[in-house]
């Protein structure tokens, strides 16, 4: 769960590729991006591009792919099954942006993106053969499921005003939740993130715990 949810999703797809919040050595980037394949949503390129070009550009407005204004379950899970978001937000300008960062034109990352299902199923099968069904189920399948639930919880709850507090008057409805932040690797310091979207840490106060921010400091060394 730590490798998939924290290293792969929160740090890799979200802060590193999605927001260019920090830099790291290439070999660490490779490991981090490999972990991101087990995100529970699917292919890695679309998630990054939709999040950046759709959600942050139109947060809680028309065009936001996963705003709870369209309903809780839409924001929680079903949005990424709607083809229109892929059509609207994956355009040439966005592709060029990520080509410059060596993401979508990297042959290895193209392989991860195009074969994400085979990699997920293959890893589960290999873990079963080598270590037994317990490792496959509780180690891999649960890790993928927990990562999906983690990210879905952030996208749904963190834009309800009753769920937390705001440090900044942003144009969206994002809020922070200290307890939720501990459980989601720092991602529920969401109002802070929408104010400083390219910061490597979402914490703005000693009482706001951002595990991902701590891990990033270690990865940069």
Language model segments and positions:
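Active-site-proximal inter-transmembrane loops
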Residues: 98-107, 163-189, 196
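Acidic active-site catalytic centers that drive phospho-/nucleotidyl reactions
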Residues: 51, 191-194
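Non-catalytic, topology-defining segments of multipass membrane proteins
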Residues: 1-153, 157-158, 198-221
């Amino acid at each position: 769960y730590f490798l998939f949810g924290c290293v792969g999703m929160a740090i890799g797809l979200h802060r590193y590729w999605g927001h260019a919040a920090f830099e790291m050595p290439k070999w660490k980037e490779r490991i981090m991006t490999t972990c991101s394949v087990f995100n529970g949503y699917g292919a890695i390129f679309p998630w990054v591009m939709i999040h950046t070009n759709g959600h942050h550009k139109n947060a809680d407005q028309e065009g936001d792919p996963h705003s709870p204004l369209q309903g809780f379950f839409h924001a929680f899970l079903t949005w990424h099954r709607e083809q229109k978001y892929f059509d609207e937000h994956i355009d040439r300008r966005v592709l060029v942006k990520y080509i410059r960062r060596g993401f979508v034109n990297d042959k290895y990352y193209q392989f991860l993106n195009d074969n994400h299902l085979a990699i997920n199923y293959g890893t589960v099968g290999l873990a079963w053969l080598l270590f037994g069904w317990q490792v496959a189920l509780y180690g891999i399948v649960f890790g993928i499921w927990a990562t999906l639930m983690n990210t879905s919880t952030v996208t749904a709850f963190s834009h309800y005003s009753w769920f937390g507090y705001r440090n900044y008057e942003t144009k969206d409805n994002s809020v922070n939740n200290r307890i939720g932040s501990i459980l989601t690797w720092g991602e529920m310091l969401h109002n802070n993130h929408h104010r400083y979207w390219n910061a490597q840490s979402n914490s703005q106060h000693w009482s706001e715990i951002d595990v991902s921010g701590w891990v990033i400091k270690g990865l940069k060394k």
